[in-house]
A protein has these predicted regions:
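Extended, compositionally biased low-complexity polar/Lys-Gly-rich tracts
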Residues: 89-104, 152-154, 163-166, 183-208
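Central antiparallel beta-sheet cores of small beta-barrel/beta-sandwich binding domains
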Residues: 55-56, 63, 70-157, 165
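Intrinsically disordered, low-complexity interaction hubs enriched in FG repeats
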Residues: 147, 154-157, 166-183
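Amphipathic/hydrophobic helical signal segments and adjacent flexible N-terminal regions
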Residues: 7-21, 29-86, 171-216
């Protein structure tokens, strides 16, 4: 009996290796959606011009976390606690972090509309931020703690919520509609861990750096 269970898991792992490699998940960011209109507003993001003007005007007074960043991610899929596959994307996207009230909002650097709402909030501990993310497609919310290192690197991680797993493993893809996949997700036996690494763009002349990155 034990042999059959192990064999079944191995078969599932082989299937999900193929599945995860075909899994072109668009990275969702995350924020705390206090109001419905807040969500609607941030669908549209900020324009390049608005961000350029902000960084140019405030270049000498920016908070440590503010600026332009490149984001990388390491994704690891687990099934029944067994690591199936790990894949990395070192330069997933370029993002801008801008202070708005008590929040540090996250925007796509190129000004394109966003499919997520995300922000950092400073804590009482230096270099530690609360990160919140609202997935607009699935209406899932995640939160975690982010570490700012040397004012130039951000690091945090979390597991993809069940709504995301359902969308990309059960409702779509080669195993669309699979009852076995649905059961594994609902039982919490499928876990997709995301580790995020942000690296800040740094230059002696920060204004020129911002403008160059925005125009590229």
């Amino acid at each position: 009996m034990k042999y059959m269970v192990v064999l079944k898991i191995r078969i599932m792992i082989n299937q999900h290796i193929k599945l995860v490699l075909s899994f072109a998940l668009v990275l969702f960011g995350c924020i705390n959606p206090l109001y419905e209109e807040d969500i609607e507003e941030f669908y549209h993001g900020k324009t390049k011009e608005e961000m350029m003007n902000y960084f140019s005007k405030n270049k000498d007074n920016l908070e440590a976390i503010e600026g332009l960043w490149t984001l990388g991610v390491i994704r690891t899929l687990y099934i029944y606690g067994i690591k199936v596959v790990t894949e990395s994307e070192p330069n997933r996207m370029d993002l801008a972090v801008i202070k708005e009230g008590d929040l540090f909002r996250i925007y796509k650097m190129n000004g394109d509309p966003i499919s997520f709402i995300a922000s950092f909030t400073q804590t009482d501990e230096s270099g530690i931020y609360d990160y919140k993310c609202y997935f607009t497609d699935t209406k899932d919310m995640v939160s975690t703690t982010a570490n700012l290192l040397d004012n130039s690197m951000l690091r945090y991680e979390y597991d993809a919520p069940k709504g995301i797993l359902m969308n990309y493993y059960y409702k779509a893809g080669p195993y669309k509609g699979s009852k076995e996949v649905k059961r594994i997700i609902e039982d919490g036996n499928m876990r997709l861990n995301w580790k995020f690494f942000w690296f800040k763009y740094v230059s002696i002349d920060s204004t020129k750096t911002y403008l160059a990155r925005m125009d590229s």
